[in-house]
Amino acid sequence: MGKLGYPCALAAATKHDVVGYDVSPHAKEILRTRRYPHRELRAQDLLEETALRVVDTVDEAVRHAEIVFVAVQTPHQPRFEGTERMPEDRADFDYGSLREAVGQVAEAAARLEKRVTVAVISTVLPGTMRREIYPILNEWTLFAYSPLFIAMGETIPNYLNPEFVLLGVDANRTGGREAADAVREVYGTLIPNVKIEEMSVASAELCKVFYNVFLGQKIVVANALMEIAHK
């Protein structure tokens, strides 16, 4: 779950029956104490109001779920943090945690012989799902890519009031249409009249990265204008 998945789960729990799973026992501790440890708008209120549960195993989560949203970190290397001059070479994100999470869901679905939709919401570079994730899926797992456009600290209001929902599916893959319909149903119930932009998985990967780059460039321009104004 983590800092992204937890507030998203709380938001989804306002309209859906939601269970969460995290490798860290900290997730259950938050529910036990009913105290949200991070600065996140509405998180404390929803922690007290919703019926979100956290289970102990991936099997329990898959047994309960029709759709599993995977929210794990895809970090870049520290040298790309921007605290020092950017290196000349380039490197992809680290997808180790993402591969492990999706793999555990696929294995659990196979053990339980239960079809489940896997919807990844993490940020990745174009081509990642085809290269890193598709080989992990099996006959029991349908797949969709639905990355979020949120700001940490405002995850819940951003999640519940999006400009649009980005949905990447590959219709030529078995179960692609079924996976798309599952994601549409979740968001349609949660956010009535929400605008859903559906496209291929590769196009959705590119759209998410370009959106992030565009926002970053706006910040760069704003900072440059501020520097000029100060001079």
Segments the model singles out, each with a brief description of its role:
Residues 11-12:
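Aromatic pocket-lining residues of Rossmann-like dinucleotide-binding sites
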Residues 70-72, 122, 169-170:
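Glycine-rich, N-terminal phosphate-binding loop of Rossmann-like dinucleotide-binding domains
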Residues 2-6:
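N-terminal Rossmann-fold NAD(P) dinucleotide-binding loop
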Residues 64-65, 115, 162:
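Local beta-strand N-terminus motif with an aromatic residue
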Residues 131-146, 150-231:
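Internal alpha-helical scaffold of NAD(P)-dependent oxidoreductase catalytic cores
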Residues 76-154:
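Rossmann-like NAD(P)(H) cofactor-binding subdomain of soluble oxidoreductases
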